[in-house]
Structure formats: structure tokens, C-alpha cells
């Protein structure tokens, strides 16, 4: 992250900074309103709205990505890249396994009472993986594997439906053990995973990086 420091000694500089802050607030408010509109629309119209937004923003319809496609990507990538992904996956599994919590229940001093905690995995988790020019296979590993180690019932990965999906990202999904992979992105992907839409399931939790619109959604 690059930070630029601006020294404002005079009236004009301070006015400029105030204007910049005002524009930033306006931009953030617009992003939030846009995201809320998409969320509400998908909640009301389901897959019909998801398809419309996907065609509008990504020029492609949402679709399921077969596991054979993920496996094929893992076979196509350079051997040294696959080795790096597999070693990273093993390290993450080892680390996350050591962090697992345990359930503990015991009798309390109060007659008939019991206290403790029950550790239970979520039923379904969604993992958002950005598309475009950037590829984040490490993000796939870091988000999918902890869920798998924790015992989450189903891990669903979504990524924008670009014409040529990134092989490194798909290979990472295969290595990490993603249960389902769906080509859908943007605010509509977040909305679909939040409320459920046709073949896109409703999830208990959604993780992963995204742009300002995805984050707002």
C-alpha cells in the first residue's frame, strides 16, 4: 500500500483536502446504494436478477464449474507451481489443525447445572475469489482450507465468469478440496450466496477479498 502525505499549511490546501474527503464520502455512499439495490433485487427475483447482472457486468451467465475442470487445471499448470500450491496447502492444514477448538462440558456447582462450550462447524461457507487481471490462488488456499479443516459441511467457491478462467485459481480450488465451484462474480454473487438463487446455495458465512462494490454488498 502506497501512502501519500500532503502538507496543508494554507487555506487553499485545506479547502482542497476538504473537497477530496467530501468526494470520497459521496463515492462511498453511491457504492453502498448500488450494492444495496443489487442485494434487494436478487432477494426479490432470485436467479433472474443474478443472470441479468452477470450479463450486464461480466457479459456471461453464471454456471457451475465441473470438478473435472478443476482437476484439468491442476494438471495443466507448471509442475513447480503445483508443487508450491500443494506444499502451501499442507502447511495451512498443519497450522489450522493446531488451532481447532474443542467442546468442553462439565457439571456446575449449581445442582443439576452444566456449563461449557460446544464447538460446531458451519453447514455451508462461501469463498469469493476475484477475477479479472489479478489471480489469487493463495487466497483460495487461505480461505478454503481452514473451513475444510474445521469440518464445514460444504465449501462453495465463486469467481467471475470470465472467458478464460485462471488455471492457477482453479488448480488451487482442486488442491484445497472445494466442494463446488460456480462462475459468478460481483455484487450479484454476494447476493446469491446471501439469499440463495436456484443452483447457487445460501451460505452461513461468506469470506474472501473483492472490490469496493463486493465489499459493500
PLM regions with names:
Residues 46, 153, 179:
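Short acidic/polar active-site loop segments enriched in Thr and Asp
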Amino acid at each position: 500500500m502506497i501512502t501519500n502525505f500532503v502538507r496543508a499549511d494554507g487555506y487553499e490546501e485545506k479547502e482542497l483536502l476538504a473537497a477530496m474527503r467530501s468526494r470520497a464520502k459521496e463515492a462511498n455512499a453511491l457504492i453502498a446504494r448500488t450494492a444495496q439495490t443489487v442485494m434487494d433485487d436478487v432477494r426479490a427475483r432470485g436467479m433472474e436478477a443474478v443472470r441479468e447482472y452477470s450479463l450486464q457486468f461480466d457479459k456471461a451467465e453464471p454456471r457451475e464449474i465441473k470438478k473435472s475442470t478443476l482437476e484439468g487445471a491442476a494438471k495443466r499448470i507448471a509442475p513447480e507451481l503445483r508443487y508450491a500450491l500443494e506444499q502451501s496447502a499442507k502447511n495451512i492444514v498443519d497450522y489450522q489443525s493446531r488451532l481447532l477448538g474443542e467442546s468442553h462440558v462439565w457439571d456446575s456447582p449449581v445442582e443439576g447445572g452444566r456449563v461449557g462450550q460446544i464447538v460446531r462447524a458451519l453447514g455451508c461457507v462461501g469463498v469469493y475469489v476475484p477475477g479479472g487481471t489479478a489471480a489469487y490462488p493463495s487466497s483460495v488456499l487461505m480461505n478454503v482450507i481452514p473451513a475444510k479443516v474445521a469440518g464445514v459441511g460444504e465449501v462453495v467457491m465463486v469467481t467471475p465468469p470470465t472467458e478464460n478462467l485462471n488455471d492457477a485459481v482453479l488448480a488451487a480450488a482442486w488442491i484445497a478440496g472445494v466442494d463446488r465451484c460456480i462462475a459468478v462474480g460481483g455484487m450479484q454473487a454476494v447476493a446469491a450466496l446471501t439469499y440463495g438463487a436456484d443452483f447457487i446455495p445460501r451460505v452461513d458465512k461468506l469470506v474472501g477479498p473483492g472490490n469496493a462494490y463486493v465489499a459493500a454488498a
